[in-house]
């Protein structure tokens, strides 16, 4: 039985991971759960899974959880120190790590697991978007086993040969007969909405994805298609793809999760209902297929498939991400940081929906390119970009 750490345990991916673990209790012992501040939810998880360790990034939440655990006669060790969490991830208490902390906040923990040579289930796309070559170099150096969890990258992975699956980050796509990776996206809730109405879009409208049940941040990213842009960058690094080997296709039904086109004209697609428990079950099962607890795809009830090219006037964030992808790690780090600030501001109704892309572009244009030498350097750039975005909001974009 493997020892599993779940980072982002109280979020959407954490929920789905724990659901799959419930269906397959013989596979994993959950030894570490990490979250930000959801004390009541974490208490319930401690009751059910009895992890050895719990990490809360909020000191106040950690203190509250300690008191509740004591009152309930539960003996989990509660941490509120990031360094201790990083040490635990590298220890013998952990074999496998579900890296599902949203945003740049998950970079250090994900890299700690990689550096320690752990089996890493990568659900935090921002970590790879920011660190790119540094991340892949760390995987190669440590020998960590990297499994893509995002439904699209998981679909691509399943459609590749075993040789390519075993060379994540250094794939020779052309040498193995791959012509192109076809990355699908639904187009979000505003695929048909008139562009003239975009400025009036509310957070409540934007978080209602037509097919997927997700957290607020990723739902907004799906509405702007920044999420697909981040996935484009992630695919570039995971599969060592060049610009000619990556294509984004709008597929509103979200049944085909991505495809791989081969040189002989064949296209291999991975399909299934839009439920994250399916790719999570795939990575948790490793070499075997396991129960995900989801319904099978009903081909007789499934909608007709449709495909179209993305409209960059409708999705300017997608264009910004594609352009940043091959400009270097500084650009992708700034893109991600500025977007996180912009999405938070939109959710707080401080800026308009249309100002998300405007803000990201302005922050990108403020910074000159520079060579990235370390993760610490990346985090400095990340901080600078966040400050720039916040200053622009205060100065120019208050609704």
UniProtKB/Swiss-Prot annotation:
SUPFAM superfamilies given in the database record: 1-deoxy-D-xylulose-5-phosphate reductoisomerase, C-terminal domain, Glyceraldehyde-3-phosphate dehydrogenase-like, C-terminal domain, NAD(P)-binding Rossmann-fold domains
Enzyme Commission identifier(s): 1.1.1.267
Q: In which pathway does it act?
A: Isoprenoid biosynthesis; isopentenyl diphosphate biosynthesis via DXP pathway; isopentenyl diphosphate from 1-deoxy-D-xylulose 5-phosphate: step 1/6
Q: Which Gene3D superfamilies match?
A: 1.10.1740.10, NAD(P)-binding Rossmann-like Domain
Q: Which domain of life is it from?
A: Bacteria
Gene Ontology molecular function, alphabetical: 1-deoxy-D-xylulose-5-phosphate reductoisomerase activity; manganese ion binding; NADPH binding
- Do the record's keywords include Aminoacyl-tRNA synthetase? no
Residues reported to bind Mn(2+)? 150, 152, 231
Catalysis: reaction(s): 2-C-methyl-D-erythritol 4-phosphate + NADP(+) = 1-deoxy-D-xylulose 5-phosphate + NADPH + H(+)
The cross-references to Pfam families, in alphabetical order and at most eight, read: DXP_redisom_C, DXP_reductoisom, DXPR_C
- Biological processes, Gene Ontology terms: isopentenyl diphosphate biosynthetic process, methylerythritol 4-phosphate pathway involved in terpenoid biosynthetic process
Q: What class of enzyme is it?
A: oxidoreductase
Cofactor requirements of the protein: Mg(2+); Mn(2+)
Q: Which UniProt keywords apply?
A: Isoprene biosynthesis, Manganese, Metal-binding, NADP, Oxidoreductase
Q: What is the stated purpose of this protein?
A: Catalyzes the NADPH-dependent rearrangement and reduction of 1-deoxy-D-xylulose-5-phosphate (DXP) to 2-C-methyl-D-erythritol 4-phosphate (MEP).
UniProt cross-references to HAMAP family, sorted A to Z: DXP_reductoisom
What does the similarity note say?
Belongs to the DXR family.
Q: What is this protein called?
A: 1-deoxy-D-xylulose 5-phosphate reductoisomerase
Q: Which organism is it from?
A: Psychromonas ingrahamii (strain DSM 17664 / CCUG 51855 / 37)
């Amino acid at each position: 039985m493997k020892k599993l750490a779940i980072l982002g345990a109280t979020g959407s991916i954490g929920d789905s991971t724990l659901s799959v673990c419930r269906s397959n209790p013989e596979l994993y012992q959950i030894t570490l759960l990490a979250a930000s501040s959801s004390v009541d939810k974490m208490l319930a998880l401690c009751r059910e899974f009895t992890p050895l360790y719990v990490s809360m990034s909020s000191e106040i939440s950690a203190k509250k959880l300690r008191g509740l655990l004591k009152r309930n006669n539960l003996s989990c060790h509660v941490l509120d120190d990031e360094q201790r969490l990083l040490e635990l991830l590298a220890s013998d208490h952990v074999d496998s790590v579900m890296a599902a902390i949203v945003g740049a906040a998950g970079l250090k923990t994900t890299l700690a697991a990689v550096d320690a040579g752990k089996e890493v289930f990568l659900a935090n796309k921002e970590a790879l978007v920011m660190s790119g070559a540094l991340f892949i170099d760390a995987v190669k150096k440590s020998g960590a086993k990297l499994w893509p969890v995002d439904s699209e990258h998981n679909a691509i992975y399943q459609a590749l040969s075993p040789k390519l699956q075993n060379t994540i980050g250094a794939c020779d796509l052309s040498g193995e007969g791959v012509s192109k990776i076809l990355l699908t996206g639904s187009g979000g809730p505003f695929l048909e909405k008139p562009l003239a109405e975009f400025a009036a879009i509310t957070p409540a409208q934007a978080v209602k994805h037509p097919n997927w049940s997700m957290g607020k941040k990723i739902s907004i990213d799906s509405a702007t298609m920044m999420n697909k842009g981040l996935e484009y960058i992630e695919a570039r690094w995971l599969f060592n793809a060049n610009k000619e080997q990556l294509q984004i296709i709008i597929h509103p039904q979200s049944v085909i999760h991505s495809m791989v086109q081969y040189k002989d004209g064949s296209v291999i697609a991975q399909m299934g209902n839009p439920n994250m428990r399916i790719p999570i079950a795939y990575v948790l099962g490793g070499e075997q297929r396991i129960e995900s607890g989801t319904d099978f795809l009903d081909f007789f009830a499934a909608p007709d498939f449709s495909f179209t090219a993305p409209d960059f006037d409708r999705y300017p964030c997608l264009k910004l991400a594609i352009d940043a992808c091959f400009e270097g790690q500084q650009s992708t780090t700034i893109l991600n940081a500025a977007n996180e600030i912009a999405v938070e501001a939109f959710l707080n109704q401080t800026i308009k929906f249309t100002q998300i892309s405007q803000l990201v572009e302005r922050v990108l244009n403020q910074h000159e390119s520079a060579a990235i030498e370390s993760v610490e350097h990346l985090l400095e750039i990340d901080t600078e970009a966040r400050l720039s975005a916040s200053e622009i909001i205060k100065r120019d974009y208050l609704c």
